[in-house]
Amino acid sequence: MRVLGIETTCDETAAAVVRLEPGGAGEILSNEVMSQIAEHAAYGGVVPEIAARAHIDIIDRLVLRALAHAGTRLADLDGIAAAAGPGLIGGVIVGLTTAKALALASRKPFIAVNHLEAHALTARLTDALEFPYLLLLVSGGHTQLVAVRGVGDYLRLGSTVDDAVGEAFDKIAKMLGLPYPGGPEVEKRAAEGNAARFDFPRPMLGRPKPDFSLSGLKTAVRLEMERLNSLSPTDVADLCASFQAAVVDMIIDRSRVGLRLFRETVGPSNAMVVAGGVAANGAIRRALMRFCGESGMRLVLPPPQLCTDNGAMIAWAGLERLSLGLIDDLTFAARARWPLDANAEAVHHGKA
């Protein structure tokens, strides 16, 4: 089976074709992504209206390119999937409308994909991972620990009570006057800094429920900046390093609590999967590798290009659902909010 996947929930326009082999393995035939970094750089963050207009400008050409690079015609597809949320509603509507139009014109099944579910299932595309497993989703918009028990069967163990991890990185970068996107810039400066110089708080450490919080940590960084008044390059590097170290400690502590809760409520975990753009952060990756080694658990880190938003993950989630007979009506509405654990209408524990 082949499915076209379309992703437009934030500031990447993406289209991909993925094939599901009879034995259950997936193959990415094409994966086209157009970033909007240049469009948003002057504003220091994503502007929803600009993002939606940029999606409109490129989506048709990107879909044609994905089909061409996959050597696939519209008639060869078995289904067309699009991220229907959560995300910036204007952008979501662009991708969803495009997919619906293609499905209607080609008389192919349409699959509305939860963007978070696509992240959750990517490890099954890259590593043929069996259920159940623990998912740490860390991105600009979401920070969650989730028990992935099957397609459409998710138990949220913990989540952020304020900012997402990626959002906090971007806000710290903006405070420090670093270029957009801020996350990679903070990591780059942190590599040159002294993480022990500033003793920033580690929010939520020791709490019995594996939730996250970043607002207090952000405030601590801001207050330290105000105390220093004029920041030297060394100050900036040390602030970034100390902030990143605090985030890493929080993630590991929360993951430890999440794993314990997973084992109590679900049972043994086949692996820990890390997804979302923040999964590309080297310090976080190294800390999670140590944590999983100590916990006797396999760590699955999809390639960086599949951690950030992309069409292949949407196509794969579409394939997983289509193979179970789960298709959607063309009246399916775009959703700005769509909690992953509410998407439980289809429960499946086998390997598609």
UniProtKB/Swiss-Prot annotation:
GO terms for biological process: tRNA threonylcarbamoyladenosine modification. Substrate binds at L137, V138, S139, G140, G141, D170, G183, N281. InterPro entries: ATPase_NBD, Gcp-like_dom, KAE1/TsaD, TsaD. PANTHER family: TRNA N6-ADENOSINE THREONYLCARBAMOYLTRANSFERASE (PTHR11735), TRNA N6-ADENOSINE THREONYLCARBAMOYLTRANSFERASE, MITOCHONDRIAL (PTHR11735:SF6). It is found in: Cytoplasm. SUPFAM superfamilies: Actin-like ATPase domain. Binds 1 Fe(2+) ion per subunit. It comes from the Bacteria. One of its GO terms (molecular function) is N(6)-L-threonylcarbamoyladenine synthase activity. Its cofactor is Fe(2+). The keyword Ligase does not apply. This is tRNA N6-adenosine threonylcarbamoyltransferase. It catalyses: L-threonylcarbamoyladenylate + adenosine(37) in tRNA = N(6)-L-threonylcarbamoyladenosine(37) in tRNA + AMP + H(+). Keywords: Acyltransferase, Cytoplasm, Iron, Metal-binding, Transferase, tRNA processing. Belongs to the KAE1 / TsaD family.
